[in-house]
């Protein structure tokens, strides 16, 4: 399994264990209650070196809620980052969150009849094969 997939699975599992509603692959059904977490896209920048595989990956995490939930969304974004920092290793890889390369944004979304807000976290993670 790739470093990207192992991190994704570890993050999803950890967020669900904390009691968050977490979705991936497809957005949740239309009447899903807010707030919820959506594990969106990810990408990998591997490097091959003599001593093993290393690289950096990026995982996008979105927190969706109504416009009145801005504080909750902000707190959940911080919880996502804190949770990601606890993922130190999986069966195959060791991980380190690159906090100085991680970005968080709170964005308005007016594509529905209900004004929404999206917390957008771009986690940047260094990894190496154990």
What are these regions (language model features)?
Residues 66-89:
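Mid-chain, well-packed structural core segment of small domains
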Residues 44-46, 66, 109:
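Short beta-turn/strand-loop junction motif enriched in small, turn-promoting residues
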Residues 53-67, 117-127:
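Oligomerization/assembly interface segments of phage tail-like spikes and tubes
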Residues 1-51, 78, 87-92:
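Small/polar-rich, solvent-exposed N-terminal microdomains that initiate assembly or binding
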Residues 3-4, 126-130:
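Short hydrophobic/aromatic patches at helix-to-coil boundaries
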Residues 84-128:
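Acidic-leaning, charged glycine-interspersed low-complexity segments
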Residues 31-34, 46-50, 54-57, 113-115, ...:
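Short, polar/acidic, helix-capping and beta-turn segments at strand->helix junctions
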């Amino acid at each position: 399994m790739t470093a990207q997939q192992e991190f994704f699975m570890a993050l999803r599992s950890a967020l669900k264990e904390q009691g968050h509603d977490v979705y991936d692959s497809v957005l949740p059904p239309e009447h899903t209650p807010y707030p919820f977490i959506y594990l969106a896209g990810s990408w990998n920048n591997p490097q091959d070196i003599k001593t093993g595989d290393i690289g950096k990956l990026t995982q996008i995490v979105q927190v969706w809620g109504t416009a009145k939930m801005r504080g909750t969304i902000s707190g959940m974004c911080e919880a996502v980052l804190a949770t990601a920092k606890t993922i130190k290793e999986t069966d195959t890889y060791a991980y380190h969150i690159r906090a100085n390369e991680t970005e968080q944004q709170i964005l308005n979304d007016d594509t529905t009849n209900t004004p929404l807000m999206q917390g957008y976290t771009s986690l940047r993670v260094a990894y190496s094969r154990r």
